[in-house]
Amino acid sequence: MSLVCYESSSSGEDDDETISDNPRMLKVPKLQESFHELYKKKPKTFDSPEFHEGRIRGQKHIEGLWFVQTYLEVDLSKKVKKGIREFLNSQSRFQSLLCSEHNVPRRLHLSISENYRINYSTKNQLVHKWEQYTNNLNYRTLKFRLGKMCLLFNDEKTRMFLAFECKFSDENYKDLISHASDCMKEFTNRNLREDFLLHISFASSLTNEDEYQNWVSQDRESHFFKTMNEIINTKIQKDQFSESFIVDSLKLSIGHLIFTFPFCK
């Protein structure tokens, strides 16, 4: 017994009928050009402060161009870190770079080149150049010590840094910097700036163009100049910062990728 009553398919009288009475489907009108422009794929940027610890990027991050940083990673001793913290506690303008915004300890960087951008498709070429170079070095380590304190500004004049100048104990570092400069020249057609300074930044603060001008002009009537001058000339216990540091590898950061090249002999 069937649950549903229906006529047998073999007994239908309308088998030869064709369905031709359906109304013709109307075409959807084309969208206006402004709509296509609205959703047109554009270069992605990652300039929101949430990507940069609350800071606004001075230079836009454009899709396909990857940020390059070449540096020596420095693990400061407990004594030096303690000295830095004590020094920073004596003022309120600068924030320590020894920890992230989430209070995660991090190592500091001694940059051996300016930061620059390369096309993503050329990143393997840059990595290969550093592999070849570090595999043919005639030394295993570089030794340096901290020099005097200085105040530095980024190119956009939006941030300033407290830093220690770095003094190397031999001449090997010069060839390393020369190679880094050659890489930047090859991939960006830019030369290393003449005032490039080997340094380790340990604290930062927001700033602006007016403060930068007050500093470079050494405007002694400026409250900002007098305050910053007092900070970098603060008498600190030199024995806390007199240690020598040894590094045995180079770091190359390309976008979110980090490559380590040990110094081989």
From Swiss-Prot:
Superkingdom field: Eukaryota
One GO CC term on file: nucleus
Region Disordered: start-end pairs: 1-22
Residues the record lists as binding UMP: L197, L198, H199, I200, S201
InterPro entries assigned: Usb1
Root EC class: lyase
GO terms for MF: 3'-5'-RNA exonuclease activity; lyase activity; poly(U)-specific exoribonuclease activity, producing 3' uridine cyclic phosphate ends
Gene knockout outcome: Deletion of mpn1 decreases cell population growth at low temperature and leads to a generalized pre-mRNA splicing defect, decrease of mature U6 snRNA levels, abnormal U6 snRNA 3'-end processing, decrease levels of U4/U6 di-snRNPs.
Record-listed AMP binding positions: H109, L110, S111, D195, F196, L197, L198, H199, I200, S201
TM region positions: none
Reactions performed catalytically: a 3'-end uridylyl-uridine-RNA = a 3'-end 2',3'-cyclophospho-uridine-RNA + uridine
Keywords: Hydrolase, Lyase, Nuclease, Nucleus
Subcellular location: Nucleus
Active-site residue list: H109, H199
UniProt cross-references to Pfam families, sorted A to Z: HVSL
GO BP terms in the entry: U6 snRNA 3'-end processing
Name of the protein this chain belongs to: U6 snRNA phosphodiesterase 1
Organism, as annotated: Schizosaccharomyces pombe (strain 972 / ATCC 24843) (Fission yeast)
Lineage of producing organism: Eukaryota, Fungi, Dikarya, Ascomycota, Taphrinomycotina
Gene label: usb1
